[in-house]
């Protein structure tokens, strides 16, 4: 039963629930019945779906998803950020130097970013040198500005690739998607205008390493491929398959959601956007191995039952259940009528739930109606119990249920649009380990004489200086005037002294009028 599982997926075309593995198989075409001898009994080949007579097997190689392939394709790259480091030095009147560093950003070019990354990988010494701040120069009473442009390379920076169209997805991209071409042949813009993302490998096609080559056998009829036996021995039909490209490689998406690189199936149409590919992990591979083992075990049980029938020359309903075909396709159905072994050609379809074939008590639904029992016997070991319930020998196994749940849970898209930021840096100092820089020439700019004052302080001092100079000018003018007055007064006094000096009668010089009066009076009295 578990076996039917994978094989039917291909034949799910006949199932109301395409893409699901069956719980059971029941004929949708049956009859007519004819008596046979026990020597005509045979065990069906459940490993090969013999539908449409495609029984010719030939070896071939095909590609499928790698085992252990996760839901996303990780593409390693690096971010390139343009950084401008600016140093300002000012030397005051006394020779004291003040240095200030500032950082700005600029948008780099992809060519320079690629060169910078190559320098980092090659260990170019310019990488180390360009990380240093520009060497500050200085001039007395001047401000010297020195700028240095660098390209900061940080790697690894991992993004996700969608294998359906090879587009890139990450939180760092605007709207979560690379704004460039679908193939990251050049660069991707980021949420920061001054940062670009580029793939480490300039040939991004190499990043799509998700396939592995397997060997199997093609089942065909007249050159038409009906299906194939995969590397694990499980048959998969191409019925219901659709064409789908993964990472630019053409192939087929089968009904079970798996993908193979079979390209000569002309009847297949292109898949719709909602038809995604299932992941291929170790668990699904393990289940496939178990299914193949179960199919082999069921065939051995069938052969044991057939041997018992031949040995004992007797047939029971329970033994007939081993002869049922476990996968969809053409086969045989057996029953016992009036102690006579009967056989009929049948085409089996998959059954997902028991309600599909037992809609009500006592009803076994075959060909859209309740199949009539004969003396409480249907076919393939199915009987009607005394209380009127339909009894089927096979019961759902835990392995089958496990596989059904596995397939249902793994139908997820390969795209994973959001990258985990924690995958970029694993430790705090990792960014410093992956820095690489493109170093243009250092630029220097020397200002005029500068007192190191702000603009308002400069105007304030200029105004105060003007007032002081004006006051000094006034004081100087006043002082000059006073000096002139003193000099003139001294000159006038000398001239006056010269004018009032007279000669007395005795012939002596009299210096003043008063002296003259005194001297004259004395002479007069005598």
UniProtKB/Swiss-Prot annotation:
Residues 1-19 form the signal peptide. Primary surface antigen capable of inducing and reacting with virus-neutralizing antibodies. Almost all human and veterinary vaccines are based on the functional aspects of the G protein. A lipid is attached at residue 480 (S-palmitoyl cysteine). Glycans are attached at residue 338. Keywords: Glycoprotein, Lipoprotein, Membrane, Palmitate, Signal, Transmembrane, Transmembrane helix, Viral envelope protein, Virion. It is found in: Virion membrane. GO terms for cellular component: membrane; viral envelope; virion membrane. Pfam families: PH_Rhabdo_glycop, Rhabdo_glycop_CD, Rhabdo_glycop_FD. Residues 20-459 are virion surface. It is a single-pass type I membrane protein. Residues 481-526 are intravirion. Glycosylated and palmitoylated by host. Glycosylation is crucial for glycoprotein export at the cell surface. The keyword Glycoprotein applies. SUPFAM superfamilies: Viral glycoprotein ectodomain-like. Belongs to the lyssavirus glycoprotein family. Attaches the virus to host cellular receptor, inducing endocytosis of the virion. In the endosome, the acidic pH induces conformational changes in the glycoprotein trimer, which trigger fusion between virus and cell membrane. There is convincing in vitro evidence that the muscular form of the nicotinic acetylcholine receptor (nAChR), the neuronal cell adhesion molecule (NCAM), and the p75 neurotrophin receptor (p75NTR) bind glycoprotein and thereby facilitate rabies virus entry into cells. Homotrimer. Interacts with matrix protein. Arg-352 is highly involved in rabies virus pathogenicity. Its mutation dramatically attenuates the virus. This is Glycoprotein.
């Amino acid at each position: 039963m578990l076996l039917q599982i994978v094989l039917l997926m291909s034949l799910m075309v006949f199932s109301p629930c395409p893409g699901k593995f069956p719980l059971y198989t029941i004929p949708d075409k049956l009859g007519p019945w004819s008596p046979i001898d026990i020597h005509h009994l045979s065990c069906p080949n459940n490993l090969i779906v013999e539908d449409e007579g495609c029984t010719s097997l030939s070896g071939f190689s095909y590609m499928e998803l790698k085992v252990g392939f996760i839901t996303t394709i990780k593409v390693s790259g690096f971010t390139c950020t343009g950084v401008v480091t600016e140093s300002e030095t000012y030397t005051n009147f006394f020779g004291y130097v003040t240095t200030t560093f500032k950082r700005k950003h600029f948008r780099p070019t992809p060519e320079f970013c690629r060169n910078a990354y190559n320098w980092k990988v090659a260990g170019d010494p310019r990488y180390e040198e360009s990380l240093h701040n520009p060497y500050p120069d200085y001039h007395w009473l001047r401000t010297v500005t020195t700028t240095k442009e660098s390209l900061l390379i940080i790697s690894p920076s991992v993004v996700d690739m969608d294998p359906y169209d090879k587009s890139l997805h990450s939180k760092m991209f605007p709207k979560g998607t690379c704004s460039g071409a679908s193939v990251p042949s050049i660069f991707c813009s980021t949420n920061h205008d001054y940062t670009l993302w580029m793939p480490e490998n300039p040939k991004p096609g190499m990043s799509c390493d998700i396939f592995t080559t397997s060997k199997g056998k093609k089942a065909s009829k007249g050159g038409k491929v009906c299906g194939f036996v995969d590397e694990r021995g499980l048959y998969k039909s191409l019925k219901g398959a659709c064409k789908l490209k993964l990472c630019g490689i053409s192939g087929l998406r089968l009904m079970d959601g798996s993908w193979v690189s079979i390209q000569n199936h002309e009847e297949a149409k292109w898949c719709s956007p909602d038809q995604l590919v299932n992941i291929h992990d170790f668990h699904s591979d393990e289940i496939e191995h178990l299914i193949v083992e179960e199919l082999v075990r069921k065939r051995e049980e069938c052969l044991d039952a057939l041997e018992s029938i031949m040995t004992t020359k007797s047939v029971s309903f329970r033994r007939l259940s081993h002869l049922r075909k476990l996968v969809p396709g053409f086969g045989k159905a057996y029953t016992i009528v009036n102690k006579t072994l009967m056989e009929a050609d049948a085409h089996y379809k998959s059954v997902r739930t028991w309600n599909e074939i037992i809609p009500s008590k006592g009803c076994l639904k075959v060909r859209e109606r309740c199949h009539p029992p004969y003396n409480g016997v249907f076919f393939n070991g199915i009987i009607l119990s005394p209380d009127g319930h339909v009894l089927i020998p096979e019961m759902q196994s835990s392995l089958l249920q496990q596989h059904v749940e596995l397939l249902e849970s793994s139908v997820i898209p390969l795209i994973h649009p959001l990258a985990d930021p924690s995958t970029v840096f694993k430790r705090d100092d990792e960014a410093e380990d992956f820095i690489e820089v493109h170093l243009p020439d250092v630029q220097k700019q020397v200002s005029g004489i500068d007192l190191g004052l702000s603009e308002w302080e400069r105007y304030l001092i200029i105004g105060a200086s003007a007032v002081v100079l004006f006051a000094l000018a006034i004081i100087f003018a006043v002082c000059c005037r006073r000096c002139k007055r003193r000099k003139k007064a001294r000159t006038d006094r000398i001239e006056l002294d010269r004018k009032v000096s007279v000669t007395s009668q005795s012939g002596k010089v009299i210096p003043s009028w008063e002296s003259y009066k005194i001297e004259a009076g004395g002479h007069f009295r005598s």
